[in-house]
Regions:
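Nucleotide-activated sugar donor-binding and catalytic core shared by glycosyltransferases
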Residues: 1-170
Length: 170
């Protein structure tokens, strides 16, 4: 199952909701899709959807999902990260009137670059590929060993220790 959440921001996120619905309708997505559509005005035709879900149900859907797709709000994509899942993150963009500014784009880019534990999608036409290649993406992310905070901390600490204790030969 794929779970999609657009959060609770009052502006619609039709671009994401419609894109996922069309991918399901075209057969690009073969598994069940459950969406939390928030204030989006597009009503999915091929996916199960709910305007809003209670927090407990959100956690349950995230835990059950094979793939979690979120908007760029930190609370939404931190939830799957906390249980070891790598989310596909599609930030809301000002140019599509999905938010009041581009802070979700900026934050998503920063997290993707610094942490390397999310799959960012800025161009919605790339979403189908990210879903189809999800297993390969997460496999490559996990093989670099930097998909968790602990792994990143350990890696950074190791580099610092090496610099401190490796002496140059005279």
């Amino acid at each position: 199952m794929i779970f999609v959440t657009v959060g609770t921001h009052e502006q619609p996120f039709n671009r994401l909701v419609e894109a996922v619905d069309q991918l399901k309708g075209s057969g690009t997505i073969n598994e069940d899709v459950i969406m939390q559509t928030g204030f989006s005005t597009y009503e999915p035709k091929y996916c199960e959807w709910h305007k809003l879900l209670p927090y407990a149900q959100m956690k349950e859907k995230v835990a059950e999902a094979h793939i979690v797709i979120t908007h760029g709000g930190p609370a939404s994509f931190i939830m799957p990260l906390q249980i070891g899942k790598i989310p596909i993150v599609v930030p809301r963009q000002l140019q599509f009137n999905e938010h009041v500014n581009n802070h979700q784009v900026e934050f998503t880019k920063a997290v993707a670059e610094r942490m390397g534990n999310i799959i960012p999608i800025y161009d919605i036409t790339q979403l189908g590929n990210a879903i189809q290649c999800y297993a390969e993406f997460i496999s490559s992310m996990q093989s670099n060993g930097l998909h968790t905070n602990n792994a990143q901390f350990n890696s950074t600490l190791e580099k610092i220790a090496e610099k401190m204790f490796i002496r140059k030969e005279a």
